[in-house]
Amino acid sequence: MFWIAKTLIAFLILLKTDCYKIAIPANLIDEVNPVLEFVDFRVQVIPYETKPLWRIKQESFKIVGISIENGLFSVCNCLILGASAIILPEQYDGHLAAAAIVQSIADNTNVPCVSLHLSPPTRPSTHLHPHLNAKSLAVAAFIKREKWKDVVVVFEEPDELLEITDMITAGHFDPDSFSSQLVRLKHGDDYGNELKHIKNKLDRYRIVINIPLQKALHFLEQAANMSMCGVLYHYVVMDMDLVTVDIDSIRGIEDCNITSFGVHDVNSEYIEDIRQEIVHKSSIRLPKKGVPYTTSIWIDTLRLLIRSMKSIQIWDEPRCGSSWKSGSDIKKRFFENPLAGISGDLHWAPSGERSNYTLHVYRRTLSFQKFAEWSSRTRRIASSEAVVIANSSEKLTLEGKHLKISVYLEAPFVMITSNGSYEGYCIDLLHKIANILKFTYTIQKVRDNAYGSKESNGKWSGMVGELQRGDADLAVASLTISYGRSEVIDFTVPYMHLGISILFKKPRIRDSDWFKFMDPLSTQVWIMTFASYFVVSVAIWIIAKISPYEQFERDEDNGQYKPVDNQFSLRNSFWFTVCSLMQQGSELCPRAASTRLLTGIWWFFALILISSYTANLAAVLTTRRMETPIENADDLAAQTKIKYGTLGRGSTMSFFNESKIETYERMWQLMSSSPGLFVQSSKEGIARVKSSDYAYLMESSMLEYAVERDCELMQIGGLIDQKGYGIGLPKGSPYRELISTAILRLQEKTELTELKEKWWKDKSVVCEQPKRKDQDDGESIGGIFIILVVGLVLTAVLVIFELITTRKPSPAQSQVIRHVNVIPSFKLGFFRWNVN
């Protein structure tokens, strides 16, 4: 145990005349041997003309231990054996002193020393890793490219926190517009508490994971079990080997949206060719895609060292205490001999570090696909044309996916049957879309029974909130597309167009009205007509009194004027105008031009009035009209008797709240001042309309459904606004275009129209409509008979009054009285004639 704790295991490439010898740590012999087998194969294919092919033989491998107490002797002993290069191991934590000894001796003797460790020891050594903060810079560039405003960064060890600090520093993020939250994981494999904290407390959906690969996979698997996958959540995994993992084999992670990085393009033909060589010529175990990061660094390091040594003539051997001349040549060739390595093109900076390297950026929705590259030279992420073309060849599909569907119960869109299953317009629509795109789904009712509105704490309720939190993949309901919602979720194209309208109860058809013949003219017109009749009658009487042509008549024989009786007495004037109004003739005829002018104007007035009355009377008597106290939203806003309101949440309420139109502003002021005007459901609003003087402002689609099934309800006016229903998806969902295309396809085939006909039209309900009447039953004009009877009675009373008030009969009256005695003779003659 003491030896393990105090010993650094170094890999020594030993130079002999017939082979290279390499010392390998005992605990890594099984891992490294396959790599050396592959390098042996790669060296064999390098042609040389001046000397025979040098080979690496597995049986020549040797283990060399360098202790801290005896470090100088151990290294010098290795050099005596002919070591031509030293490779420091991948891990030497706790042995920094021994590593420093090896590095110092290598520098003094000029023996090439290459480190497999990501970070160099106290003295810089040559290594093939990208810079220590390369991943941090790449992640920072990705966050800025995506314009994220907040992230959660997950880590476990202090050195991982150091990389995160580098990331935040390198990003130069504006503290006013960007925030990050650090979450340190406890040791172990259970991350449930940390995930609950992220989901419920932090309420953030962009998570950077900087932990080892296996731990990262456990973290993602547990996140998937807590419904923290899907297009809403986005994970950035900093481990370089994630892209080589068959992630679809891990339950639940296949739905996670993940971005990761790698040193090579796992989908390139070059990497695939190398993979095939490794598989066929060695026992290295490789994943299904790409080459693991550590393996690629191993292979590139050995290949570059061997190529550098084989490119020169080595005449001397290294010795402790002296500088090895051939070592300088090997180092020079090492940096001057570029290599297209598995870990990328190898270029070097003067400091001995890699430069001009590229990290490939992968995004996973269906599978890991390269979509961009990060360059160490520009420190930016850019999508090359080749990457764009490659990505365009990947066909996005929902086939085989299983989606969680959030629904809101609202007839006829979504309803529950007696056996607990769902039905309705939206359910049929979802089924048709699923058949087109070949996905399966599970339906879940929205927990808080709301469409979704922004709360005072900035969070969204209802289906919108579930999409934001990742609790649902789709929201399929009568979900209105609005500006506020579209800022936090995505919508498909509208599957139905609609607007806000007014639901009101039908007025009762007025019972039999014997004075209906007065309806063609309003009360005001009747009053004005009688007033005109009185004024014109008096005017004719006055003008006739004044005009000389109504007092005298020209004698045609001698041309002299002789006085005559004025025919337009006050009584005759009223009689004359009423005869004209009733379009009847009279024995009176005006003589003067003034009276004739007034008479002509009165006749014109009577003509228009009677014509209008006749036309309106025909319509009134043939159709039973239902009179409503309001005709549109303006009428509703202008009165106070009929109360009105909307659903207490949702887009209709938001429309009136945000409207700048004066009428709707007044309506909102009234509604907001009386919270009792709002209802909790459309069912409650409809019941309130039927039971009281209440108008319910609702979306026309549900209004049509209610009117179709209840003959007591009706729509008032047209649409107040124009909008549409769409299917909701999480923001940035790649499936929006697929589902929108499916909706357009159904629309083109008129299947959406058929669905509406199916769910809106109720053939069992037939509402009686006002009908035209071919015959009048007398109910509408019975009043004229009443007027006739009253007129006869008044006439009889009047004639009796005239007889009583006249003391001495005039000659004419006496003649009439005498004629009364002949009535019996008239009756007798009538009966005789009838008998004959």
From Swiss-Prot:
Residue ranges, Extracellular side: 20-523, 622-780
Segment forming the signal sequence: 1-19
UniProt-annotated glycosylation sites, renumbered to this chain: N225, N257, N356, N391, N419, N657
Chain sites annotated for binding L-glutamate: S478, L479, T480, R485, S651, T652, E699
UniProt membrane topology term: Multi-pass membrane protein
Locations listed in the record: Cell membrane; Postsynaptic cell membrane
Keywords: Cell membrane, Disulfide bond, Glycoprotein, Ion channel, Ion transport, Ligand-gated ion channel, Membrane, Postsynaptic cell membrane, Receptor, Sensory transduction, Signal, Synapse, Transmembrane, Transmembrane helix, Transport
A GO CC term attached to the entry: postsynaptic density membrane
Outcome (variant: M582R): Normal cold receptor function
Topology feature Cytoplasmic, residues: 545-600, 802-836
Main localisation: membrane
Keyword Ion transport among UniProt keywords: yes
Family: Belongs to the glutamate-gated ion channel (TC 1.A.10.1) family.
Function: Ionotropic glutamate receptor. Activation by glutamate requires additional verification. L-glutamate acts as an excitatory neurotransmitter at many synapses in the central nervous system. Binding of the excitatory neurotransmitter L-glutamate induces a conformation change, leading to the opening of the cation channel, and thereby converts the chemical signal to an electrical impulse. The receptor then desensitizes rapidly and enters a transient inactive state, characterized by the presence of bound agonist.
Name of the protein in its database record: Glutamate receptor ionotropic, kainate glr-3
